[in-house]
């Protein structure tokens, strides 16, 4: 969860409008175009035939919760893959190079209230939390040995894999981190005997927030 100095103008869903019962009944769960002016929100419903702006004053004893939804495209590394035990080989931890392109749905929650800056002045206080879910596709490497191919005396090398799967993300503002579950497809002649071919693994996604 991070602090935001100014809410960007745009479309949001009003999840909660505290301290304004009549306004909450009219606008709750609606898509609204929101503009922040100091400690006041200007709310314009999407569904209104002739939109009329409503003003919502932020207060220290109540809060507003807004949700912004959008599609998200990012590039991530997968620093850790955990492979379950298989064919007599114990649980494996893969820390070799892995990268992926991620496409998914992003949910940004904004918690807005009012705080005292000085004894004579109050200002908006905004905290933001970003979550996401989606799919990824990428390229990585893995150690190929006789233990994972069953070919005694075979060569040992770093093999290339294509991987794909699903992931959930948390936006820590300066970086993104998430959990992934996927499958690997080994490229090369050992793909038919590799014990992890198309077998599930779980891992961690990590990427810097470049937006």
Q: Where are the predicted features?
A:
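Outer membrane beta-barrel transmembrane domains
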Residues: 125, 130-162
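Transmembrane beta-strands of outer-membrane beta-barrel proteins
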Residues: 69-75, 99, 129-137, 177-179, ...
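Transmembrane beta-strands of outer-membrane beta-barrel pores
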Residues: 77-83, 105-109, 137-143, 172-174, ...
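N-terminal leader/presequence regions that precede the main folded/catalytic core
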Residues: 1-77
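Predominantly the C-terminal beta-signal and adjacent terminal strand-loop region
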Residues: 173-211
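Residues that define the transmembrane beta-barrel architecture of outer-membrane proteins
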Residues: 69, 93-99, 129, 158-164, ...
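Short loop/turn motifs that connect adjacent beta-strands in outer-membrane beta-barrel proteins
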Residues: 61-69, 109-131, 174-175
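Outer-membrane beta-barrel translocator domains and adjoining extracellular loop/strand segments
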Residues: 85-90, 115-116, 145-152, 190-194
């Amino acid at each position: 969860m991070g602090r935001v100095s100014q809410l960007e103008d745009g479309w949001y869903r009003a999840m909660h409008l505290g301290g304004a019962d009549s306004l909450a009944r009219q606008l709750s769960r609606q898509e609204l175009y929101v503009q922040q002016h100091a400690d006041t929100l200007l709310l314009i419903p999407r569904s209104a035939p002739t939109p009329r702006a409503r003003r919502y004053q932020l207060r220290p004893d109540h809060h507003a919760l807004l949700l912004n939804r959008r599609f998200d495209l990012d590039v991530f590394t997968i620093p850790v893959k955990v492979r379950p035990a298989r064919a007599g080989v114990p649980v494996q931890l893969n820390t070799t190079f892995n990268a992926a392109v991620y496409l998914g749905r992003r949910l940004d929650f904004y918690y807005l209230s009012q705080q005292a800056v000085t004894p004579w002045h109050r200002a908006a206080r905004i905290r933001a939390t970003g979550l996401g879910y989606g799919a990824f596709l990428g390229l990585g490497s893995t150690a190929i040995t006789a233990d994972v191919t069953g070919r005694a005396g075979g060569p040992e090398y770093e093999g290339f894999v294509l991987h794909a799967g699903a992931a959930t993300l948390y936006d820590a503002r300066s970086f993104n981190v998430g959990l992934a579950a996927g499958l690997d497809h080994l490229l090369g002649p050992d793909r038919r005997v590799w014990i992890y071919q198309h077998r599930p693994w779980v891992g961690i996604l990590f990427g810097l927030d470049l937006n």
